[in-house]
């Protein structure tokens, strides 16, 4: 009973069957009560509506199963049938008297119910398609039927490795294996053995620990032996462990003893001994370590192999996987014999044996190499048949094998003594000759291919063999005379096979299509030319066959847009209509091209020239290049590693190409990218993916030539001046091209990306798109490391991240300059570049001056007059020492030129594209300056009161004419602002700190901090400027001249308030330097001695040092720091020239009156210098207090007094360089230009006496308008002469603008 339950998969611990199930047997199988019980339960489950509905008041009757569990053998048969009839709703005939024919009862009374059950069985029968031939039982799957058949045949292929038990299913045998463990270890005796084993293990571990301890303290003696029980304990433990794990119920199967120790040789122990990987114990011999591991760490050893495990479950799973599978092939019949079945199906991969073939078939799916379905064309194998079916569609679609013959049926035409096939077979005939090894008529050229195929000496792949077959062509083509080259076969000296089956032709075509890119390209070109040539043999004009060949040999293919058809154009200019099939073949032949990635093969590709009568030469480097070549897409040329990827990729090209029929096919070689010269027979395309030669499916037959690829580099990709391939190919073939084709642009062609297959209208868009694949990013940000593929990306980046740094100048660094101004500006833009780029390069060159360098002469020669040149020659940099003023400027020029060269080298070493950035910037700067000049003129004309500046004795008339002329010249050649300024200038009364590329403005009077310059200006006006205004109102001293001048300056500067504050501030400071410098030039000889002596007499009013306003001390704005010539702007207001009281701002009166000076905006600039020296300390080395530095010319404001807090000021004769915001390098070009208008201002005011120079005072405090005016970008116009407003709050006269 136990064994039967094991076979059925039932545990032996099941209780015995109920007594009523072992009653009288009906028909030798089941008891009657059991049969009734089964039928009733089936009917109740199938038809639940037959159950009686219990009343809620009454107790529900007992269920059928509860009644069935009553011992029915004690009840009469009539009561059982009545119970069944009550369930079925039928009355039982009492005449049966307990003897009932069950079949008659069911057939007669329940015919309707059984018919419904039969319908359900019919539905189940349809789903179960596999019936058992012996018992009729049906199964859904054949595998379940095969397992069921073992119950009839008695086959039990799974044998227990420890006993003679066999099982028909593997799961049953696994259950049986558990009985070995449970039957032995679950009893009490097994538990005792397990406890003894653990005890021995602990003793063994203690002994090993003592032995290690003694070995470390004392030297082990050879005669010392362990106690007898110490040696026997491990062996006993080993034996007990083995018996406990692998004991068998039958004595006839003893447990095999482990291998004797004498089998293993004693290994030479190293100095450290053998260490256990589990417990890190050391042993002298390998045997001791193995025994230790087997007893303590892996006590569960398999008796069938050398496997050992640390847990019992691991050992059981090992037996199930290893030993049951090995024994599963031994079939056993009903007689219990152990003979092996003759019908074996063994797996060739893993060796597993199966009893049925379909088992093996299902098992082979587990292995990766089980590709059973093979393609007869290309030999590719698939796992599933539908994969092969889809694969065959690829062959039919890609190869386009269509039986399109001419109007007449097959006509045999003699060619070389061989009968020809139909036009439909032309496609594969030339590929078959590729496959057959290019059979020559005399079989002489078959030496290498025949050896390759016949003897098989070279272990090459079939693709490499086909590639090597192409090598004899070049040698054959040279030996053929010209008379035999009227056809393609004559040119190749080949004879194709006469007949071939369809499958062979498909195989040849597929192999050619799957060749590596070089050989595949050759095969497709060979086929396309063959179709064009063979069309002559299949045409109607058979008597004129030879003439037709000659015509085709020198013919080109054109597309007539008026007639919308293709025509053949001969060498004499005659046109002939081209049939549709030949047009199709031309397209097929022209759709093959080489990828631009295969650089090693670029120099070795020599193909057909432009004419069809040229020789065919294939110059390959050798078979070594054919190995491991990727596969190329025939449509777009994209390269893939496997052919399967090409098939998947080909779905992209299945959509219809619009405009393909509207294009122009010029020549059959056009797609190979041939050049315009006859000598160039190479098709080596540009290795740059952005070149125009990568356009594949353009519809016009190709991309540009090598000579025409320059079109892609121009900003106008559709320029008609660019040469295209069709025109060049037509010229080389001797065909006169129509004017319509010459004038056409490539914009109508469809350009395809060779990487992703996207289509573009122009080559320019394709070139921009290709940068995504190539990683090219030509548009680089001048402020950071960002680079973009398109100009729009860089524009967005600059707008997003560097808006405050952009000074409104220049295009992007990667943009090509405008073509209209390239020639004009090429000779005038040599050393100008963006100031932020020059900032890092020219920092640290304190002595450089662009005016002394030869490079600046390019500007002065075209702009300045001879008088200006002489005036400029006398002008020196403010950094030149006083002793250098007496000499010439030639040594200074050479010095500056060397420093400019050094700065240029530093720029080039930093990766700055000097010429490109220079040209692009200057082109845009000229246009912006012209536009700005026009706007300034309109604003100046609209504001007449600001234009009037009163002079003395009509002295303003003479400079006005020259200034207007000079202003027009300056507008065309406006110099670049090279002033070096910090990233974010500070407002007067605030400091700037840069954190995380953000400029933070901090108020000097309180703890207010903001990143917005406008908010800081509002804060200063609301909280701090109002106090100064109230304090100033208490004094109550005003001057009408200054009030009117300040109102005029407000009106002049009100339209010019813009957000670009850095540029305006730097230009104002530069103009301050230039004005002071020109004053120094006129006063040099008079004041040199006085400056050296350090005398203050005649320069500064004594009251100048007593400055009462604390507010202006905070800002460092000293209102008295205005130049001479102030009285000339207000002659009517201050005729006596008396000075004001001490409450007013003191007067600065220099010795001479040869120059005018700046207004109170220069005071604001000086306050900027003070703030920058306080907050940033950028140029501390420029603050000099040595006495000899007092001899420098008047060029800038002093920084010593401003850094001291404003208690005292140096005189204007002791000028120091303004280094807070402007470096000497940036000042130099500004001085050269801003001083042009000031050079003419010497004579009108030269004769004025000193008392006529009215004093200047600045009583009004700084308001919001003056703060924003200091940062206005259009403030540059007033100082450069681009506007006609005075913009002076101190009534300072600008002689170059007075006449406007």
Curated annotation (Swiss-Prot):
Highest taxon, organism lineage:
Eukaryota
Identify the species of origin: Homo sapiens (Human)
Gene Ontology terms: biological process: negative regulation of neuron differentiation; negative regulation of retinoic acid receptor signaling pathway; negative regulation of transcription by RNA polymerase II; regulation of DNA-templated transcription
- Kindly list the places in or outside the cell where this protein is found, as annotated in its UniProt entry: Nucleus
User: Which segments carry the region annotation Disordered?
Assistant: 1-26, 47-77, 584-604, 650-739, 802-826, 856-893, 937-985, 1124-1260
Composition bias (Polar residues) maps to: 675-696, 856-880
The segments annotated as C2H2-type zinc fingers are: 130-152, 158-180, 274-297, 300-323, 345-367, 373-395, 631-653, 751-773, 779-801
Q: Its function? A: Transcriptional repressor that negatively regulates neuron differentiation by repressing retinoic acid-induced gene transcription. Binds and interrupts RARA from binding to retinoic acid response elements (RARE) composed of tandem 5'-AGGTCA-3' sites known as DR1-DR5. Recognizes and binds 2 copies of the core DNA sequence 5'-CCCCCA-3'.
Protein name in the entry: Zinc finger protein 536
For molecular function, the Gene Ontology terms on record are: DNA-binding transcription factor activity, RNA polymerase II-specific; DNA-binding transcription repressor activity, RNA polymerase II-specific; retinoic acid-responsive element binding; RNA polymerase II cis-regulatory region sequence-specific DNA binding; zinc ion binding
Composition-biased stretches (Acidic residues): 1160-1170, 1178-1187
PANTHER family documented for this protein? ZINC FINGER PROTEIN, ZINC FINGER PROTEIN 536
Q: Which keywords does the record carry?
A: DNA-binding, Metal-binding, Nucleus, Phosphoprotein, Repeat, Transcription, Transcription regulation, Zinc, Zinc-finger
Record field: compositional bias (Basic and acidic residues): 48-69, 594-604, 657-674, 950-972, 1133-1143
């Amino acid at each position: 009973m136990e064994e039967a339950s094991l076979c059925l998969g039932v545990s032996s611990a099941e209780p015995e069957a109920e007594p009523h199930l072992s009653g009288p047997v009906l028909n030798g199988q089941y008891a009657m009560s059991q049969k009734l019980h089964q039928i009733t339960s089936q009917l109740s489950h199938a038809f639940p509506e037959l159950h009686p509905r219990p009343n809620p008041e009454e107790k529900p009757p007992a269920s059928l199963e509860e009644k069935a569990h009553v011992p029915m053998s004690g009840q009469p048969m009539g009561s059982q049938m009545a119970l069944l009839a009550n369930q079925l709703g039928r009355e039982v005939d009492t005449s049966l008297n307990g003897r009932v024919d069950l079949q008659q009862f069911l057939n007669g009374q329940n015919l309707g119910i059984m018919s419904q059950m039969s319908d359900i069985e019919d539905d189940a029968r349809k789903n179960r398609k596999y019936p058992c031939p012996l018992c009729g039982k049906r199964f859904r799957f054949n595998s379940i039927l095969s397992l069921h058949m073992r119950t009839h045949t008695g086959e039990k292929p799974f044998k227990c490795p420890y006993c003679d038990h066999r099982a028909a299913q593997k799961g049953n045998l696994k259950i049986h294996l558990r009985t070995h463990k449970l039957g032995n270890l679950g009893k009490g005796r097994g538990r005792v053995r397990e406890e003894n084993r653990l005890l021995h293990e602990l003793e063994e571990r203690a002994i090993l620990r003592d032995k290690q301890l003694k070995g470390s303290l004392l030297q082990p003696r050879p005669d010392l032996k362990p106690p007898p029980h110490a040696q026997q304990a491990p062996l006993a433990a080993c034996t007990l462990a083995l018996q406990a794990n692998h004991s068998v119920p039958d004595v006839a199967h003893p447990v095999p003893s482990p291998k004797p120790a004498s089998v293993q040789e004693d290994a030479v122990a190293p100095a450290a001994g053998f260490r256990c990987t589990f417990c890190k114990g050391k042993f002298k011999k390998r045997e001791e370590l193995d025994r230790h591991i087997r007893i303590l760490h892996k006590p569960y050893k398999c008796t069938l192999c050398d496997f050992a495990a640390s847990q019992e479950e691991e050992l059981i799973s090992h037996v199930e996987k290893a030993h049951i599978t090995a024994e599963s092939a031994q079939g056993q019949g009903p007689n219990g014999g152990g003979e092996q079945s003759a019908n074996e199906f063994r797996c060739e991969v893993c060796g597993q044996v199966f009893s049925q073939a379909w088992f093996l078939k299902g098992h082979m799916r587990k292995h990766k190499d089980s590709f059973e379905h093979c393609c007869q064309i290309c030999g590719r194998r698939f796992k599933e048949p539908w994969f092969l079916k889809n694969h065959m569609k690829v062959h039919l679609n890609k190869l386009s094998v269509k039986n399109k013959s001419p109007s007449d049926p097959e006509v045999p035409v003699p060619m070389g003594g061989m009968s020809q096939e139909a036009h439909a077979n032309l496609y594969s005939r030339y590929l078959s000759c590729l496959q057959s090894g290019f059979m020559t008529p005399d079989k002489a050229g078959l030496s290498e291919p025949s050896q390759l195929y016949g003897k098989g000496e070279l272990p090459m792949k079939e693709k490499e063999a086909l590639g090597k077959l192409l090598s004899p062509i070049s040698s054959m083509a040279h030996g053929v005379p010209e008379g035999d080259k009227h056809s393609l076969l004559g040119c190749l000296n080949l004879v194709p096979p006469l007949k071939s089956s369809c499958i062979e032709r498909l195989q040849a075509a597929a192999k050619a299509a799957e060749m590596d890119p070089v050989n595949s390209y050759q095969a497709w070109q060979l086929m396309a030319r063959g179709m064009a040539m063979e069309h002559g043999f299949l045409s109607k004009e058979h008597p004129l066959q030879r003439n037709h060949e000659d015509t085709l040999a020198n013919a080109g293919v054109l597309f007539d847009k008026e007639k919308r058809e293709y025509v053949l154009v001969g060498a004499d200019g005659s046109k002939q209509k081209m049939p549709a099939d030949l047009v199709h073949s031309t397209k097929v032949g022209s759709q093959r091209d080489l990828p631009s990635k295969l650089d090693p093969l670029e120099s070795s590709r020599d193909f057909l020239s432009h004419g069809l009568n040229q020789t065919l030469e294939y110059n390959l480097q050798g078979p070594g290049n054919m190995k491991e070549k990727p596969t190329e897409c025939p449509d777009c040329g994209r390269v893939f590693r496997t052919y399967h990827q090409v098939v998947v990729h080909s779905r992209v090209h299945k959509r219809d190409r619009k405009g393909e029929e509207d294009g122009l096919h010029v020549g059959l070689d056009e797609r190979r990218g041939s050049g315009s010269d006859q000598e160039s027979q190479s098709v080596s395309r540009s290795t740059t993916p952005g070149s125009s030669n990568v356009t594949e499916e353009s519809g016009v037959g190709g991309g540009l030539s090598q000579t025409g690829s320059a079109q892609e580099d121009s900003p106008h990709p559709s320029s008609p001046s660019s040469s295209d391939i069709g025109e060049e190919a037509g010229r080389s073939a001797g065909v006169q091209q129509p004017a319509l084709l010459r004038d056409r642009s490539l914009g109508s062609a469809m350009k395809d990306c060779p990487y992703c297959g996207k289509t573009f209208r122009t080559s320019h868009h394709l070139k921009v798109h290709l940068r995504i694949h190539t990683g090219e990013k030509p548009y680089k940000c001048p402020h950071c490391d960002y680079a973009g593929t398109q100009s729009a990306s860089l524009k967005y980046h600059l707008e997003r991240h560097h808006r405050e740094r952009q000074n409104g100048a220049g295009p992007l660094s990667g943009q090509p300059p405008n073509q209209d101004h390239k020639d004009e500006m090429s000779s005038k833009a040599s050393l100008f570049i963006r100031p932020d780029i020059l900032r890092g390069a020219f920092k640290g060159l304190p002595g450089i001056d662009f005016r002394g360098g030869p490079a600046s002469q390019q500007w002065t020669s075209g702009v300045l007059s001879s008088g200006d040149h002489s005036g400029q020659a006398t002008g020196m940099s403010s950094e030149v020492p006083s002793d250098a003023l007496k000499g010439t400027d030639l040594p200074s020029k050479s010095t500056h030129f060397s420093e400019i060269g050094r700065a240029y080298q530093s720029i080039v070493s930093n990766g700055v594209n000097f010429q490109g950035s220079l040209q692009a910037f200057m082109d845009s700067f000229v246009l912006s300056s012209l536009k700005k000049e026009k706007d300034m003129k309109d604003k100046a004309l609209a504001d007449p009161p600001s234009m009037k500046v009163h002079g003395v004795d009509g002295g303003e008339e003479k400079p006005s004419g020259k200034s207007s002329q000079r202003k027009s010249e300056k507008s065309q050649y406006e110099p670049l602002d090279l002033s070096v300024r910090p990233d974010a200038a500070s407002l007067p009364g605030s400091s700037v700190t840069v954190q995380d590329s953000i400029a933070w403005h901090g108020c000097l009077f309180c703890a207010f901090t903001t990143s917005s310059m406008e908010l800081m200006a509002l804060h200063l006006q609301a909280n701090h400027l109002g106090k100064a205004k109230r304090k100033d109102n208490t004094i109550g001293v005003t001057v009408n001249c200054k009030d009117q001048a300040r109102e005029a300056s407000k009106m002049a500067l009100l339209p010019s308030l813009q957000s670009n504050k850095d540029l305006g501030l730097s230009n104002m400071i530069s103009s301050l330097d230039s004005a002071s410098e020109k004053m120094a030039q006129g006063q040099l000889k008079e004041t040199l001695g006085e400056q050296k002596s350090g005398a203050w007499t005649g320069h500064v009013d004594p009251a100048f040092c007593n400055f009462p306003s604390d507010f202006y001390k905070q800002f460092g704005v000293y209102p008295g720091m205005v130049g001479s010539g102030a009285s000339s702007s207000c002659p009517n207001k201050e005729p006596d020239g008396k000075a004001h009281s001490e409450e007013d701002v003191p007067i600065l009166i220099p010795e001479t009156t040869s120059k005018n000076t700046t207004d109170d905006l220069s005071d604001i600039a000086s306050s900027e210098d003070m703030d920058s020296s306080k907050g940033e300390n950028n140029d501390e080395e420029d603050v000099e207090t040595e006495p000899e530095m007092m001899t420098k010319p008047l060029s800038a404001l002093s920084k010593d007094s401003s850094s001291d807090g404003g208690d005292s000021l140096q005189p204007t004769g002791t000028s120091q360089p303004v280094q807070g915001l402007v470096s000497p390098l940036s000042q130099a070009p500004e001085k050269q230009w801003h001083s042009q208008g000031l050079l003419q201002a010497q004579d009108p005011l030269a004769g004025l006496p000193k008392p006529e120079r009215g004093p200047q005072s600045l009583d009004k405090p700084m308001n919001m308008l003056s703060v924003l005016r200091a940062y206005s970008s259009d403030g540059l116009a007033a100082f450069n002469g681009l506007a006609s407003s005075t913009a002076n709050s101190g009534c300072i006269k600008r002689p170059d603008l007075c006449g406007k």
